[in-house]
Amino acid sequence: MIRRNFIKTSGIILGSTFYLPSILASKNLNSRLNIGLIGVGGRGIQNWKPIIRTENIVAMCDVDDRWAYNALNEIKQLHPNVKKFKDYRVMFDKMKNSLDAVIISTPYHTHFHAAITAMELGLHVCIEKPVAHNVWEC
């Protein structure tokens, strides 16, 4: 065996032992993400409307019943099994195993708390700036 071929073959085998498990365990690139929405009114509308047809909305949360009701009616047309919550902490408790990511569209001073909770659960977070209300939260 030529040394160059040995090194090349060894590199391919070694690389595949690390690379293949990540491919097999990952989601299909064509599969939809399971999204949770935190804050569905006001600016939140502009954050969830673009993805309503491309991703699975599995949970939504808003403290304002008017916004939640309007959003729920629209989201349920495409995602009839979406769950509605008033408190994002309850949503995380009940839905954490069903979520891949959350979109946080709450007032600025509440971004940090919802985002850090989601990240601690291993969820991906989509959030607008500012992420934190003050420097001590960063």
Residue ranges of predicted features:
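Beta-loop-alpha module in the N-terminal Rossmann-like domain of NAD(P)-dependent dehydrogenases
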Residues: W67, V82-C138
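N-terminal Rossmann-like dinucleotide-binding module
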Residues: I13-L78
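Non-transmembrane alpha-helical segments in soluble domains
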Residues: I7, K49, L72, R89-F92, ...
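N-terminal secretory signal peptides and thylakoid transit peptides that target proteins
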Residues: M1-L14
